[in-house]
Amino acid sequence: MFAKDAGKLMKAALLGLLLAAGSLATGCGGGASGKTLDIADIGWTENTAIAQTTKVLLEEEVGYEEVTVHTSDLDSVYEDVAEGDLDAFQDVWLPNQRHLLSSVEDDVEQLSFSYEGETEQGIAVPSYMNTTSLDRLNESEADLILGIEPTSVVMGQVYDAVIPAYGLEQELVQASTDGMLAEVEKRYRNREEFAFIAWSPHWMNQRYDLRYLEDPKDAFGELNDPARITAIVNEDLPEDDPVAYAFMDALILDEDQLNDLESTINEAGDPLEGARRWAEDNPEVWQPWVQAAQDAQ
């Protein structure tokens, strides 16, 4: 009789432990368990970094079943978010992309700024060159301006306005961002004279000693004005998924944090693995974002 009773007690205790463990596992995901999210990555370095970090934290800390990062482009991403094909795009530069945002503003919601600072972009040179201004670039030995994707706003401005304004004799080279950065790395190591499209925030500002060239004729126009980085979500997301909405609205990085995140990804050679390594090393940065998501459950 005692053995039978002891067996029942042991089974009851084991069942209690299993239920408790199940409760804890459910509690980790809470209201996020089973949820999915679709976010955009247009291939810009900061977009990739933020999107992959969002995926890592929502899946591993908040409990989402899957966050899918979709390859997109600037020409279609706004419409895709507005139509609900994508839930969010986290690399909106304002005022640079104001015209794109205006076309869908009734169908999307803009979140809080995700970058604690202002951007900078233009043509840069390594600091070992003596050139400080665009009107003196022809006096250097640089024969190339290493560029990025031809569809980018900055490339269009360089081709249509900057080169004619200064009579620049350098060839403007079109390439992917990764291709340009590989060429910058090679030429910088060889201490060659060259110019290239540069912007901040980006890990290049941490890796290279570079100088943004002055633009006395204001040929870059509005691109000379500092921009802010924010995110947009489909108008239905705040109601359909308040957890993801709260997380992305709370997400914010300063210049050092974003440069460090991008550098970690670059060194890892894989965006997802790099984002995971950065998250492991910087819990104090992202814990408020996760807390905001948990509070919304």
Regions inferred by a protein language model and the residue ranges of each:
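Short, well-ordered beta-strand elements
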Residues: 33-46, 54, 64-70, 142-146, ...
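A bilobed periplasmic-binding-protein/Venus flytrap-type ligand-binding module shared by bacterial periplasmic
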Residues: 120-131, 227-241
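A conserved helix-loop-strand patch within extracytoplasmic ligand-binding domains
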Residues: 106-153
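Short helix-initiation/N-cap motifs at beta->coil->alpha
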Residues: 44-45, 67-79, 172-183
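Ligand-binding cleft/hinge of the Venus flytrap
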Residues: 54-63, 141-173
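C-terminal motif of bacterial Sec signal peptides marking the signal peptidase cleavage site
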Residues: 23-27
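Short helices/loops that flank or line small-molecule/ion binding pockets
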Residues: 52, 57, 75-89, 178-197
